[in-house]
Amino acid sequence: MSDTTILISALETAPGVIIPLIREVPADRLKRRPSEGKWSAYEHAIHLSQSDVAFRARLDLILSGPEPLIKTIENSPEDEAGAMLEVDLDASLDRYVRERASLVERLKQLSPDEWQKEAVHEAFDHYSVFIMFRHLLNHEMFHAYRIEELLLKKDWD
């Protein structure tokens, strides 16, 4: 099995790990922030549901020409202030599943050369399609870890 096959498989199955984790968070904790400026499990989930669109756009950009510039994605001040708490969770998770399935199908069609295609990233020393989607997986697992921390947190005072 190649590295790309393993990566695609992990991306394909990630929603099956993350969504049940989100559903396990008790309703009274779901939107509760652990401290000022830190996201709730709900916000982490909404954020994850929005990520594939940006990474799909980056893929299209990288494949469109030689070494395009990839800008760092920053969270909006509105999101940091709690705007994601107003987004419908069920609709967002449905979107996450749909967009992930579409993204996975697109990734399965990439050639070995396309996986290695490089871009210039403003924050990283080197960047390729493979690195980008490995980064997406790591990003998801980071947020899943944060959700699990909030799920299991004992001391909420």
What does each model-identified segment do?
Residues M1-R29, Q50-L61, R134-N138:
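Alpha-helical bundle segments that constitute or directly flank the non-heme di-iron/ferroxidase center
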Residues S2, I6-S9, R33, P68, ...:
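Solvent-exposed interaction patches of small proteins and small membrane subunits
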Residues A10-P15, D79-Q116, M132, L136:
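Acidic/histidine-rich alpha-helical segments that form the ligand environment
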Residues L21, V25-D28, P66, L110-D113, ...:
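A short secondary-structure junction motif
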Residues P26, S35, L69, E80, ...:
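Glycine-rich, flexible loop/turn motifs
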Residues K31-N75, V104, E118-D157:
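Short, contiguous alpha-helical
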